[in-house]
């Protein structure tokens, strides 16, 4: 395949590294090196969506010619609510108290156990879990066992912009990201995001200014949600408008591909 396409450029948007505890990250790293890295090393160039990922592939896995081309988001589709819109959307979704959205597929690195334990600490807050995946059944059973009446599993949704505008914060206690589109969508929607201080998330969020970066421990996550202010979301929106629109992302990608073409 690579002999047939000697100038092949690969785009990498998977997690690359997952920060599992108890040495789990090193097992993941070994698997990635065995299964993914050989193909990356044979490509003409590799594009990835965060500066951290580009540095990591080069430094840890010895991949050459890696270029960071950060993601963009549609800031017209994902926007803060207009006056009165949030209240109307809360009525549509039956939200009568503060609500937190968790937009993440049900896979191990998304750390839904921390979500459920955080919800247990905040019984006065509704948690809306959007996404499907191999662990959906497990987390449904866990929520029932924990008696979490404030947790809803919404599955796959086509109304994400409206859901963002209906809630008050977003929680993503992730253990592995490259560059999270859900984080960018939430920020563009003017929401405070509470997430973990893994490298790719720290590229998007400045703790205490455009969101919160806290360890994935339920008491810390719950406290950050209690303290989340609208100002975080306003500054997050301004950051995305300045650096991560679709137009900006397209221009970055076009410029990188043009440079690679000219270099031969």
How should each PLM-predicted stretch be described?
Residues 18-38:
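Nucleotide-sugar donor phosphate/pyrophosphate-binding loop at the beta->alpha transition
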Residues 98-121, 134-137:
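A conserved mid-protein helix/loop that constitutes part of the nucleotide-sugar donor-binding site
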Residues 206-217, 224-229:
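Conserved acidic donor-binding segment of nucleotide-sugar-dependent glycosyltransferases
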Residues 230-249:
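A short, well-ordered alpha-helix in the C-terminal region of glycosyltransferases
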Residues 192-195, 205:
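Short hydrophobic beta-strand element within catalytic cores of glycosyltransferases
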Residues 156, 175:
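Aromatic "clamp/platform" in nucleotide-sugar-dependent glycosyltransferases that forms part
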Residues 2-20, 47:
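Active-site proximal beta-strand in glycosyltransferases
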Residues 52, 72:
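Carbohydrate-associated surface elements
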